[in-house]
Design a protein with these regions (language model features):
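Extreme N-terminal tail/first-helix region
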Residues: 1-22, 156-158, 163
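Residue-level marker for the onset of beta-strands and adjacent loop->beta junctions
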Residues: 21, 43, 72, 125-127
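Charged, gly/pro-rich active-site loop segments
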Residues: 84, 88-163
Length: 163
């Protein structure tokens, strides 16, 4: 097993296996700051992880979805697992869309304790956000071992990753 595969295995152990993960999700605000420069916006979301993608249920008119519609570049961070990553956000559409049936079933299971309270599936704006990781750094035991992963090219990055 190479280092990239080792890192993927650790990500699956930490975030996969049907876990409800609290992650910080950063997007770019639609309105620039006073100097006309982009402003980051961050919030905590519950996410399901599978095969280098985090999935979130949300509302199609939420700020995060509107921001991602204008700029798909996102970043995430977790604690205490110490994983930071960049990725591409994509609105997969209404949770009841037939193309989402398998994923919706998984999300309902993972988020069972609160899913129905937080989501109105009859509202066509109740949607699934996919965060497709592009690169990231998994920090094991406070800098004992760093896995700098390029998820697009499926390799490790020699010159550092995302901190």
């Amino acid at each position: 097993m190479n280092e990239y595969e080792e890192g993927l295995k650790l990500l699956e152990e930490k975030f996969g296996c049907g876990k409800d993960n609290a992650i910080s999700l950063a997007t770019i605000a639609r309105e620039p700051n006073a100097e006309g420069k982009p402003r980051p916006v961050v919030r905590t979301v519950d996410a399901y992880y599978e095969d280098t993608v985090f999935y979130v249920t949300t509302h199609g008119k939420s700020n995060k979805i509107q921001q991602i519609a204008e700029n798909q570049e996102v970043s995430i961070a977790t604690s205490p697992e110490m994983f930071t990553a960049s990725g591409i956000g994509e609105n997969l559409g209404w949770v009841l869309d037939p193309k989402n049936v398998e994923l919706r079933t998984k999300l309902r299971q993972v988020f069972a304790q609160w899913y129905d309270m937080a989501n109105n599936e009859k509202d066509e704006n109740c949607c699934i956000l996919a965060i497709r990781l592009t690169r990231g750094t998994l920090n094991i035991n406070h800098w004992e071992k760093l896995y700098h992963m390029d998820f697009v090219n499926k390799t490790t990055m020699e010159n550092g990753g995302v901190f």
